[in-house]
A protein has these predicted regions:
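Sec-dependent N-terminal signal peptides
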Residues: 4-14
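Extracytoplasmic cell-surface/polysaccharide-interacting catalytic and binding patches
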Residues: 18-246
Length: 246
């Protein structure tokens, strides 16, 4: 089934179901949680994840260490305000080099999400590198994980073992995948994030993206939002899409 068809059926079925006052209150809390504005219960040391994801991550890092792979988390839970700061900093910087608003937005969403739409808001997703060898500068670059790069051994280990711990690569190198660029460092704890994505698709995305604090929000037209939903929020690995529909 095409993504657009799946989404149409999803929204139609959910729109036909009346919500009680309790369900509406729960939905409001759910919206805050999914958009990085809630107060999720997070655990972890130099990372923060929801409990079930954190336990699985600890188990995975221990298994990797036995194979001399030292996994280091460089980003995990990220709230709305943090994502807003990242977005606005990039938007302002791009303005100084002369990009038009549309060029600016397109450039930012090569790798960064619009605040309120990041999977990092859920406490299920984490960016990983290897603690050794040490790398100076920007460590989240795809070439560092490929061929003979410093994180190539980590990638090989994750390719072989990560799924067995529930972690799946989100933005894979697939020709048919659209949206965000390839990110060999970004993993999601599927047992929980699958459920969260299903919930997220029931939110009113336009009201989230129209936050006046988000620079450039006036260019988030209805057409853009639909495009962003289908190609970016749902521009994830084919495996994750299949799991979502089960």
């Amino acid at each position: 089934m095409k993504i657009t068809t799946f989404l149409s059926l999803f929204f139609l079925l959910n729109s036909l179901l009346p919500l009680s006052a309790q369900e509406q209150s729960s939905l409001s809390s759910q919206t805050l949680l999914l958009t990085g504005q809630g107060s999720p219960v997070l655990i972890g040391g130099q990372y923060k994840l929801v409990e079930e994801a954190a336990i699985a991550f600890e188990n995975m890092t221990q298994a990797a260490a036995q194979d001399s792979i030292i996994i280091l988390a460089v980003s995990s839970y990220r709230g709305f305000d943090r994502q807003l700061a990242i977005w606005n900093r990039k938007f302002t910087k791009n303005e100084t080099i002369g990009l038009t608003p549309y060029q600016n937005i397109k450039k930012i969403i090569e790798y960064s999400t619009i605040p309120g739409t990041s999977r990092h808001h859920w406490g299920t997703d984490i960016d990983l590198i290897s603690a050794e060898p040490k790398v100076e500068g920007d460590v989240l670059q795809a070439h560092l994980f490929e061929n003979e790069g410093p994180y190539a051994d980590l990638k090989k280990w994750m390719d072989k073992h990560a799924n067995s711990f529930g972690f799946h690569l989100v933005y894979t190198k697939e020709d048919k995948r659209k949206g965000f660029q390839y990110e060999p460092w970004h993993y999601s704890y599927l047992p929980t994030s699958k459920k969260y994505l299903e919930w997220y698709l029931n939110l009113e995305l336009e009201s989230i993206l129209k936050d006046e604090n988000i620079l450039g929000n006036e260019y988030f037209t209805e057409e853009f939002i639909q495009h962003y939903l289908e190609e970016y929020i749902l521009g994830i690995s084919a495996n994750l899409l299949v799991q979502m529909k089960k």
